[in-house]
Amino acid sequence: MIKIVGLVGWRGMVGSVLLKRMQEENDFSRIKPVFFSTSQFGQDGPIINNISYNILENAYNIDVLKEMDIIITCQGGSYTKEIYPTLRKNGWKGYWIDAASNLRMKNDSVIILDPVNYNVIEDSINKGIRTFVGGNCTISLMLMSLGGLFQTELVEWIAVSTYQAASGAGARHMIELLNQMGILYKSVETDLLKGSHSILSIEDKVTKISRSVNFPVKNFSVPLAASLIPWIDTEMSNGQSREEWKGQAETNKILGTKDTILIDGTCVRIGSLRCHSQSFVIKLKKDVSLEDIEEIIRNHNKWVDVIPNSIQDTLLKLTPSSVTGTLNIPIGRLRKLNMGKKYLSAFTVGDQLLWGAAEPLRRMLNILINI
């Protein structure tokens, strides 16, 4: 029987990417979609595959939401906080798929990344779990790249440095970054075109403008263009940022590990638009040849791509500009470190809006509609 699927937050950045992927994979032919809105209910809905969905339902109408077999939401944490418990208290037994982080660590939820933890997902469905939540973007991208090493239980611990895109903070942040870039360029455009000023004088002008009170920093609080921000999310009592705390907590929940795999590091915001990059130092449980490591990683899933550790391959294939908008998960800079034969270096890049956000939700929907 075709399931009725409610879609909430489909106009936003993650929701828009989700809808595009669903159209590309012809997912709408397998469901009866109902589109909801928090602010424009009653207005015309979208046109999907030449089918017009005329009326947007009220995303706060519990009675209508209760009619859904599945609800998939990219509306954000505030919506989840208000609606999810109310729905459950009103007896709704449907499946809830969520991009927001609120429910990730709840005992009655599963963090979804089926190429990595399909067995965990399948087991949870059989046990009656009905809440499925997308993971933190960097963690999902890490697991997609290193999934083979986790699957073969080779990882003792990981130290990670992230280089996270503006998209992870939201659409307004992306716009602010581009505005910052534009202001900095315009301030020295004439100097660059004429070539009459030294680069140091140009740099000095750029720096002064980025420090001025009129520079747009409403969203990031500080300049990101021509800079970086070595803190993401809130502050924890142990000195970690919450983004750094998620690394170990969410990874172990996703994998369903009995013994905790230690993961820690520093999360940094950079001027990339929508691709996160990560640098890993991995302590292996035993010495494994680099050739075998590459084979283990390569064989885990069809999206991961082992990049040869050469200058040319790295520059061409292991950058945000080469990965943005694709499902590819390149991993490179693979080499043993001077610390010993069990110490491995790796670097990976992935699209924050695809495998980092929308794609696990889409794939979870397909798992549920096939039940």
Swiss-Prot record:
One of its GO terms (biological process) is 'de novo' L-methionine biosynthetic process. One of its GO terms (molecular function) is NADP binding. Phosphate binds at residues 104, 246. Substrate binds at residues 164, 243, 269. It holds the Pfam family Semialdhyde_dh. It catalyses: L-aspartate 4-semialdehyde + phosphate + NADP(+) = 4-phospho-L-aspartate + NADPH + H(+). Pathway: Amino-acid biosynthesis; L-lysine biosynthesis via DAP pathway; (S)-tetrahydrodipicolinate from L-aspartate: step 2/4; Amino-acid biosynthesis; L-methionine biosynthesis via de novo pathway; L-homoserine from L-aspartate: step 2/3; Amino-acid biosynthesis; L-threonine biosynthesis; L-threonine from L-aspartate: step 2/5. The keyword Transcription regulation does not apply. Its EC number is 1.2.1.11. The keyword Transit peptide does not apply. Keywords: Amino-acid biosynthesis, Diaminopimelate biosynthesis, Lysine biosynthesis, Methionine biosynthesis, NADP, Oxidoreductase, Threonine biosynthesis. NADP(+) binds at residues 11-14, 38-39, 75, 167-168, 352. InterPro entries: Asp-semialdehyde_DH_CS, Asp_ADH_gamma-type, Asp_semialdehyde_DH, NAD(P)-bd_dom_sf, Semialdehyde_DH_NAD-bd, Semialdhyde_DH_dimer_dom. The active site is at 137 (acyl-thioester intermediate), 276 (proton acceptor). PANTHER family: ASPARTATE-SEMIALDEHYDE DEHYDROGENASE, DEHYDROGENASE, PUTATIVE-RELATED. Catalyzes the NADPH-dependent formation of L-aspartate-semialdehyde (L-ASA) by the reductive dephosphorylation of L-aspartyl-4-phosphate. NCBIfam families: asd_gamma (TIGR01745), PRK06598.1 (NF005144). Belongs to the aspartate-semialdehyde dehydrogenase family. Homodimer. This is Aspartate-semialdehyde dehydrogenase. It comes from Buchnera aphidicola subsp. Acyrthosiphon pisum (strain APS) (Acyrthosiphon pisum symbiotic bacterium).
